[in-house]
Amino acid sequence: MGVSNRLAWGCPTKEHLLPHFLEHLGNNHLDIGVGTGFYLTHVPESSLISLMDLNEASLNAASTRAGESKIKHKISHDVFEPYPAALHGQFDSISMSYLLHCLPGNISTKSCVIRNAAQALTDDGTLYGATILGDGVVHNSFGQKLMRIYNQKGIFSNTKDSEEGLTHILSEHFENVKTKVQGTVVMFSASGKK
C-alpha cells in the first residue's frame, strides 16, 4: 500500500491518508471495506470500532490486526444493499478508504452505497474516505500501468471516476461535502445527511 500510494498514486499514506482518516474519526466508528486493517491500528483505544466487508477473511484479518478488544461488531454485508435497521443512526463516523474505486460500475451507480452508509450515521455524523480517480487527473507511467491491469482484472472499476462525479453523488445525500485531490487520489468528507 505504501509503495503504490507514494509512487503510483502520488498520495503518501502517512502524510495524507492517515491524517485524513484520523481527523474525521468519531468515538463510534464503522470502517467499510476494511482491507488489511492498517488504519485501525492507529485509532485510540477508547474508540468503538465496527467493521463491514463482504469478505469474511478480510473482516477477520482486519480485526486481528487492529486488536479484537477494539472491535465492537464484524458485519458481513454487501454495501449495495440497504443496511439492517439495527444499524441506522448508529455511527458518529463511517470511513470508506479505497472502497469506491474497487466497486463495480461507474461512479453514479455507486450512489446507493453512499445512501446506505448515510442511513447508518447519526444526524451529526461524518462519512469520509479516499478513492483513486481515473478521470480528471494525470497518472504517471506506473499509475497508468496499475490502472490498466487492475481495471482489466476487475479489481478496480474507476476509469471514468472523477472528483466532480464523486462530489455529485455525495451531494445527493449530504449538505456539506469537501474534497481534496492529492496526486490521483481524492480524499472526501461529507456531513449533514439529507
From Swiss-Prot:
This is Putative uncharacterized protein YbcY. Disulfide bonds: none annotated. GO terms for molecular function: methyltransferase activity. Signal peptide: none annotated. It comes from Escherichia coli (strain K12). Encoded by the cryptic lambdoid prophage DLP12.
